[in-house]
Amino acid sequence: MKVISSIQELRDQLRGQNRTAFVPTMGNLHEGHLSLMRLARQHGDPVVASIFVNRLQFGPNEDFDKYPRTLQDDIEKLQKENVYVLFAPTERDMYPEPQEYRVLPPDDLGGILEGEFRPGFFAGVCTVVTKLMSCVQPRVAVFGKKDYQQLMIVRRMCQQLALPVDIIAAETVRDEDGLALSSRNRYLTTDERKEAPELAKTLQRVRDGVLGGERDLGKLEQTARTHLAERGWAPDYISIRRRANLIAPSAAELEAGEPLVVLAAAKLGATRLIDNLEI
């Protein structure tokens, strides 16, 4: 596996490749990330991964400086997955001058849920993903469903900008107790780690309620928020939305069996966790 930081060297290395499968990451890789590499291999060859902690998608009070950086461990894991190239640029490589041009998602998708609680987050994501796509020029790119809203925004962005890349969705990988794998799980204390699977269990109860015929979605959402709050969580949102566009479903759509997803974000101690479950 080649480890490359220069955009020009990356382009030289990939020249002539027309089936490249790309997996962008911020590093601190876990089994969820590695499953993306394996899925990428099913859809293209060679597989290219990137590791770049993107300052643009962190808010002023977020964890950019303490975000785990484990490059050597990550390299070893990617080598075992037979990744062809790891693109690991520095900030100077990616942003040699102030990034004044940004890619802004529409408010109807980028300003809700995560976008409401993390202003500017999706503009940072869209900008860096567009730039990475320009560098790698893949045929397919793989994103995890754990970041459901991000997946939808990136997919729509590629369609709207006519980027010649297919976005592949990968299922969320969970620990044995149901907790969705995340680089931020390492921030949890021992007691918090024991409590953390309750987020997934709460989403499962919401899902069961909808499938059981409950049509008062607001009641289901409020019950779930209250349940987590009583256990010491600080929920940002628990919301049932249409899978197609993350808009709240109408009563008619509910009766017609509209495909739904319940999404959640909540703080447990100092750690903010997100999860979702399709219904």
UniProtKB/Swiss-Prot annotation:
Belongs to the pantothenate synthetase family. It is found in: Cytoplasm. GO terms for cellular component: cytosol. It is an enzyme of class 6 (ligase). Homodimer. This is Pantothenate synthetase. It comes from the Bacteria. Catalyzes the condensation of pantoate with beta-alanine in an ATP-dependent reaction via a pantoyl-adenylate intermediate. Its main location: cytoplasm. Signal peptide: none annotated. Keywords: ATP-binding, Cytoplasm, Ligase, Nucleotide-binding, Pantothenate biosynthesis. It catalyses: (R)-pantoate + beta-alanine + ATP = (R)-pantothenate + AMP + diphosphate + H(+). (R)-pantoate binds at Q57, Q150. GO terms for molecular function: ATP binding; pantoate-beta-alanine ligase activity. Pathway: Cofactor biosynthesis; (R)-pantothenate biosynthesis; (R)-pantothenate from (R)-pantoate and beta-alanine: step 1/1. Its EC number is 6.3.2.1. The keyword Cytoplasm applies. One of its GO terms (biological process) is pantothenate biosynthetic process.
